[in-house]
A protein has these predicted regions:
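A glycine- and small-aliphatic-rich helix-loop capping segment at beta-alpha/alpha-beta transitions
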Residues: 13-17, 35-40, 60-62, 161-168
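Glycine-rich phosphate-binding loops at beta-strand->alpha-helix junctions
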Residues: 134-138, 142-164, 178-179
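Adenine-nucleotide phosphate-binding core of ATP-dependent small-molecule kinases
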Residues: 93-144
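Glycine-rich phosphate-binding loop plus the immediately following alpha-helix
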Residues: 38-89
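Short glycine-aspartate micro-motif
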Residues: 19-24, 44
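Glycine-rich phosphate-binding/hydrolytic loop that grips phosphoryl groups
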Residues: 3-12, 52-57, 64, 170-187
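Short beta-strand scaffold segments in enzyme catalytic cores
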Residues: 28-34
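Short, high-confidence coil segments that cap the C-terminus of an alpha-helix
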Residues: 17-18, 142
Length: 187
C-alpha cells in the first residue's frame, strides 16, 4: 500500500522534487516519504475519516461525510474545546491562543449543537493527524507535502492542514482527484 500511496501521488501531482512526503488521509492516516526513488513508510495514525464518521455517528447520530462536513462548517469548536486562551490566557510558542488545549473540555450540551460537536470531532482528529505529519516532515526535512485520500474533503480538516503546515513553512498540496490516487498507484 505504501508504494501505491507514493506512486499514486506521483501520477496525480507530477512532482518535480526528488524528495517529498505524501499524506494519505483515508479511514486512518499514513505518511510516506519519497527520496530519490526510494519509498519509506514514515508513520501515521489510526485516526482519519473512519474515526470522524464513527465518532460523528456515536455523538451526533450522523455518519454521512457530506452531512458531517456541512455541519462542521457551520460549527464552532470553541463551544466544545477549551482553547489556550481559556486555560493560560494566550498563545504558547507558535501556537495561537485559538488552538485547542483540551478537546471536548468545555462540553456543555445546553450551549452547543450538532454543528459545534461536528467541528469538535474534526478538530480533534485533525490535530492528531497534523501533529503526526508535522513531526514526520520536520524530522525528515521535508519541504513539499502532497495530500491524497478522501478525508481532506472535510473543509475544516483541509483548513487545519493548511494553517498547521504554514507554521513550518510548508504548503500542503491537494488535488481534486486525490481521492483516487491510491487506485491509480496500484496500476
Amino acid at each position: 500500500e505504501v508504494d501505491a500511496i507514493v506512486k499514486g501521488a506521483i501520477n496525480t501531482f507530477h512532482p518535480k522534487e526528488e524528495r517529498f512526503m505524501v499524506m494519505s488521509l483515508g479511514s486512518g492516516s499514513a505518511c510516506a516519504i519519497f527520496n530519490e526513488g526510494d519509498i519509506l513508510h514514515a508513520g501515521g495514525t489510526g485516526l482519519g475519516g473512519g474515526t470522524i464518521r464513527g465518532l460523528s455517528k456515536l455523538i451526533i447520530g450522523e455518519d454521512d461525510p457530506k452531512i458531517i462536513n456541512s455541519l462542521s462548517s457551520k460549527g464552532k469548536k470553541e463551544k466544545v474545546d477549551l482553547l489556550l486562551k481559556d486555560v493560560i490566557s494566550g498563545p504558547i510558542g507558535n501556537l495561537p491562543e485559538s488552538a485547542s488545549a483540551v478537546n471536548f473540555g468545555k462540553i456543555d450540551y445546553s450551549d452547543c449543537n450538532k454543528e459545534d460537536l461536528a467541528a469538535g470531532i474534526i478538530s480533534m482528529v485533525g490535530q492528531t493527524i497534523l501533529k503526526t505529519a508535522i513531526t514526520i516532515a520536520s524530522i525528515n526535512d521535508i519541504k513539499k507535502v502532497y495530500v491524497i485520500g478522501r478525508s481532506y474533503k472535510y473543509d475544516l480538516l483541509r483548513e487545519m492542514l493548511i494553517d498547521g503546515f504554514r507554521v513550518i513553512n510548508i504548503e500542503p498540496l491537494f488535488h481534486e482527484n486525490g481521492e483516487y490516487a491510491i487506485c491509480v498507484g496500484t496500476i
